[in-house]
């Protein structure tokens, strides 16, 4: 049985970009200052206040967004006053996003605006340096994921100092409005988190028009707003983290209820031996949906999410293909108890949904071998949870705490050295030195 915990990894990240895992992270936009993209934790959905609203009436998250919008440099051939108003309206649309993650970059510092003020384009950059020190043989890789904690500990790797610029990246944002599409946004993001944390990797590429989103985007099954902020890039291990090519419809009714559903191109992770069993190509789209109730202008919400998928394998003993239905269910919430205090919670369970989770996506757990019958695979059960809180000491200094666990339930107890469950605990402290420059540390 493998029990994974972390007590001794301290990440300090110095970044021109953002923070992840115990790190001091500085973020920067390629446009001039280091552009930090850390948008505090989970209440971004709510903050559509206008630029005219008094600052003292805004929450700390809304103040951050307003400050970033006010600092945006607009390049236009039209009237400069109108341009500032137009860019504010368009950028509010950028930040009010159900699927926006804490570590996503902020809008580009420089924005080109059309003469009529209905179209804006910006190209931004993000410099993010993460560093860590491990003094008790916790984990042999950059970042932190309990799945990779070695059991037993490796005596040759009991102390480790590391740093990476893998979060550094580029992004392009197109924002606009017209009579046919309504409000629309195109977004492309890539960074150097690919092979060996050096190769360039596409992170997102999607187009949103009105209630529709098409492209490579965050899965509808993931609630990015219900997660505490972490410097660690992986985040709490008991949550979901998945990006798919998808077609999604999302609509909000009377500012209180939101429903969404999507067809997502599948990518299953099946553990087979190639002798008695073999995974088959995916051919049925994953289906994800949620219903959400929100209040406080969207700063708080409760959400129920569901996932259904078809997992196919071949029994090489009898020479026949089989389909197994995989599913997942999730309850998630963000609650703004006070203007400066947020609470987060997520509980996820299911069978055959493991590749959507943070920890179990590190290996092949959607289907595994049946220990009682050769040639058979089955979808094991897994349960995970995330609890968190965030507190703003000032409008620029805030802290997050997170507690999370992922449990894996195969038909038989795993043997020694095999994953059974992982525990995750983290404390993060962030300081927004400017609207586009941030440092942080995590334990």
What are these language model-derived features?
Residues 112-143, 155-268, 283, 288, ...:
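Outer membrane beta-barrel
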Residues 105-109, 150-157, 228-232, 272-274, ...:
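Extracytoplasmic loops and strand-loop junctions of Gram-negative outer membrane beta-barrel proteins
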Residues 18, 46-135:
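N-terminal periplasmic/intermembrane-space "pro-region" immediately following the signal or transit peptide
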Residues 183-194, 263-265, 304-310, 398-411, ...:
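Transmembrane beta-strand segments that form the barrel wall of outer-membrane beta-barrel proteins
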Residues 1-54:
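Bacterial Sec-dependent N-terminal signal peptides
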Residues 137-147, 358-363:
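Short, flexible, mixed-charge acidic loops at enzyme active sites
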Residues 293-413:
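Detector for outer-membrane/organellar transmembrane beta-barrel domains
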């Amino acid at each position: 049985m493998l029990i994974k915990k972390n007590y001794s990894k301290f990440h300090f990240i110095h970044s021109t970009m953002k923070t992840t895992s115990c790190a001091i992270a500085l973020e920067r936009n390629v446009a001039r200052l280091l552009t930090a993209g850390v948008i505090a934790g989970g209440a971004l959905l709510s903050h559509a206040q206008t630029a005219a609203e008094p600052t003292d009436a805004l929450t700390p998250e809304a103040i951050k967004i307003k400050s970033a919008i006010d600092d945006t440099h607009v390049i236009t051939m039209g009237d400069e006053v109108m341009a500032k108003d137009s860019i504010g309206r368009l950028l509010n649309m950028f930040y009010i996003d159900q699927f926006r993650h804490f570590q996503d970059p902020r809008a580009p510092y420089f924005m080109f605006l059309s003469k009529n003020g209905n179209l804006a384009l910006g190209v931004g950059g993000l410099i993010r340096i993460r560093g860590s020190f491990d003094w008790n043989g916790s984990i042999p890789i950059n970042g932190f994921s309990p799945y990779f904690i070695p059991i037993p500990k490796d005596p040759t790797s009991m102390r480790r100092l590391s740093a990476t610029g893998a979060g550094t990246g580029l992004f392009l944002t197109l924002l606009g409005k017209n009579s046919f599409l309504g409000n629309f946004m195109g977004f492309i993001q890539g960074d150097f988190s690919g092979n060996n944390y050096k190769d360039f990797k596409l992170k997102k590429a999607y187009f949103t028009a009105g209630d529709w989103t098409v492209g490579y985007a965050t899965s509808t099954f993931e609630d990015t707003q219900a997660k505490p902020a972490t410097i660690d890039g992986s985040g709490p291990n008991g949550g979901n983290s998945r990006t798919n090519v998808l077609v999604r419809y999302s609509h909000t009714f009377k500012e209180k209820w939101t429903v969404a559903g999507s067809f997502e191109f599948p990518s299953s992770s099946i553990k087979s031996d190639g002798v008695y069993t073999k995974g088959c190509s995916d051919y049925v789209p994953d289906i994800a949906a949620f219903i959400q109730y929100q209040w406080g202008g969207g700063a708080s919400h409760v959400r129920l999410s569901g996932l259904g998928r078809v997992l196919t394998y071949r029994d090489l003993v009898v020479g026949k293909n089989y389909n197994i239905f995989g599913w997942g269910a999730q309850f998630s919430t963000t609650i703004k108890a006070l203007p400066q205090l947020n609470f987060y919670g997520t509980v996820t369970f299911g069978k055959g949904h493991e590749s959507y989770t943070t920890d179990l996506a590190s290996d092949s757990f959607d289907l595994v071998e049946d220990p009682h019958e050769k040639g058979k695979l089955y979808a094991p059960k897994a349960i995970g949870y995330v609890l968190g809180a965030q507190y703003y000491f000032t409008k620029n200094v805030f802290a997050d705490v997170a507690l999370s666990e992922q449990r894996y339930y195969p038909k038989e107890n795993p043997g020694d050295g095999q994953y059974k469950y992982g525990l995750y605990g983290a404390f993060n402290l962030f300081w927004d030195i400017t609207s586009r420059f941030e440092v942080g540390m995590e334990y």
